[in-house]
Amino acid sequence: MYAEVVWSTFDRLPLVAPEARASVETGLIALCRRLDVEPVAVKVSATRARLVLRFKPAHSIGAVVTALKLGSQDAAVVAGRPIRWAPGFACLSLSVTEVRRRALRLRARH
């Protein structure tokens, strides 16, 4: 299953500093691979994280996203800027054709 997953910072404040974004993205990609989830596209902005992911049938999306949020907070602390994510997340299932379109658009942003 392909899905776009999005979560925001606490109160949508710009808590992800520009110099920490690449580190957080790299950390999210590595964590996805450890969780056996395919990261198709990953983008972190000042106020949110947006990922296009390929899940396996046995995955619990909620458990994966919880692990990703916690792991990305750790990556940001290592980069020197703590992040506080807001509770919850949005998830939208994607068709195979929509995956390509969203991944390209996500990579072109910011």
Named regions from a protein language model:
Residues 1-110:
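Charge-rich, low-complexity N-terminal segments
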